[in-house]
Amino acid sequence: MVKGKRILIGVGGGIAAYKICEVVSQLFQQGAEVRVILTAEAEKFVTPLTFTTLARHPAYGDADFWQPIHHRPLHIDLGEWADIFLIAPLTAHTLAKLGHGFADDLLSNTVLASSCPILLAPAMNTDMWEQEAVQRNLQQLLGDRRYHLLAPNGGLLACDRRGVGRLAEPAQIMHRLQALLFTGGQEDLRGKRILITAGGTQEYLDAVRFIGNPSTGKMGLALAQSAGDRGARVTLIHGPIGDLPIPMGVISMAVVNAEQMEQALAQQAPLADWIVMAAAVADVKPAQTWTGKIAKQDLPDSLPLAPVPDLIAQVSKQKRPHQLLVGFAAQAGDIVTPAKEKLQRKNLDVIVANPIDQPQSGFGTDSNQAVIIDRHGSQTAIAPCSKLAMAHRIWQYLLERI
């Protein structure tokens, strides 16, 4: 989603500046053009050479502002060049300058000369962050619709205290940049209550053996991340997802088997505006189960199976007129015909059909491709892309077509 995009990064003078090295590296690796501006204080923590090496382009500081070697004023050139502007770490000092429209260095001049969306990622001591003056300056900026906040995390700070003030992690910054680039800063899902299921379920035979599938939950997590970034209130019901992190701001409920997911859905589905069933629920379970671990020699020669609850059918039957229900269909070969049949059979509003027999698609991968089919008979193909990009395209489709 960042390939070919022009991303300008302003680095403030805080110890968290080192994290921005990882952001610049990831952006470059994903095909973005990156330019970096350092304040004089930032250069005391990370050198311009570091960012020059990572971005494959000279990093700029205040000394460059006054050099007569640029064909146009540097702050004008950079401000007009950028598709998006990240300021991280945003210090209390830089925040105060921007909030009052000061223009006394390269970074502050470039902010005033730009017209693109600006993502603010603050980092500072908790007491500083909570000061009335700091919050007043922040609200002053956020009154301008092109400014967007990636709030600081809580945790151990460089001052050896615990509290709110840690710079957002590089992965969080990357996700938010991608969302802003895709939406232009529009929080077009604000006010929506979205319920998402993700991951596989596991139906245990004994204490260690189970019937399941290779789903990792990456697609559902991408849907949750992107919906939250677009302003939705997201609840995620997920099966086992290993150590994959739950996106910030998302309410999560962990389950193991289909029966537990059924109970969670019964509680949460009536509260949602949109319900997206992206979980890969195991279709069957052992008809008989054992406590403890069965010795290998005692395993049954045949294993009677029983169906698990048809969760999407249950949700469909209980769906209210204002609710939107989206299903997923993972298939090999012809993915469209079975998906259309499932759409009709389950009375869905939309179904997303994705292949499991194509390279870099399906379970466990970071990318995917799909065909979206809706109840009106319309269908749209999504070419191979990251699962996060696909998630944004699904939301865009629902907003525009349904």
UniProtKB/Swiss-Prot annotation:
Keyword Acetylation in record: no
Keywords for the protein's UniProt record, in alphabetical order: Decarboxylase, Flavoprotein, FMN, Ligase, Lyase, Magnesium, Metal-binding, Multifunctional enzyme
Biological processes, Gene Ontology terms: coenzyme A biosynthetic process; pantothenate catabolic process
Gene Ontology terms for molecular function: FMN binding; metal ion binding; phosphopantothenate--cysteine ligase activity; phosphopantothenoylcysteine decarboxylase activity
Manner of cofactor binding, per the entry note: Binds 1 FMN per subunit.
Catalysed reactions, semicolon-separated: N-[(R)-4-phosphopantothenoyl]-L-cysteine + H(+) = (R)-4'-phosphopantetheine + CO2; (R)-4'-phosphopantothenate + L-cysteine + CTP = N-[(R)-4-phosphopantothenoyl]-L-cysteine + CMP + diphosphate + H(+)
Binding sites annotated in the UniProt record for CTP: 283, 293, 309-312, 328, 342, 346
A single cellular component GO annotation: phosphopantothenoylcysteine decarboxylase complex
Entry-linked InterPro entries: CoaB-like_sf, CoaBC, DNA/pantothenate-metab_flavo_C, Flavin_trans-like, Flavoprotein
E.C. no: 4.1.1.36, 6.3.2.5
Cofactor(s) this protein requires: Mg(2+); FMN
Pathway participation: Cofactor biosynthesis; coenzyme A biosynthesis; CoA from (R)-pantothenate: step 2/5; Cofactor biosynthesis; coenzyme A biosynthesis; CoA from (R)-pantothenate: step 3/5
Record: active site: 159 (proton donor)
Region (Phosphopantothenoylcysteine decarboxylase): 1-193
Region (Phosphopantothenate--cysteine ligase): 194-402
Pfam families per record: DFP, Flavoprotein
Signal peptide positions (record): none
Keyword match Flavoprotein: yes
Functional note: Catalyzes two sequential steps in the biosynthesis of coenzyme A. In the first step cysteine is conjugated to 4'-phosphopantothenate to form 4-phosphopantothenoylcysteine. In the second step the latter compound is decarboxylated to form 4'-phosphopantotheine.
Family: In the N-terminal section; belongs to the HFCD (homo-oligomeric flavin containing Cys decarboxylase) superfamily.
Protein name: Coenzyme A biosynthesis bifunctional protein CoaBC
Native organism: Synechocystis sp. (strain ATCC 27184 / PCC 6803 / Kazusa)
The organism's taxonomic lineage, starting at the top: Bacteria, Bacillati, Cyanobacteriota, Cyanophyceae, Synechococcales
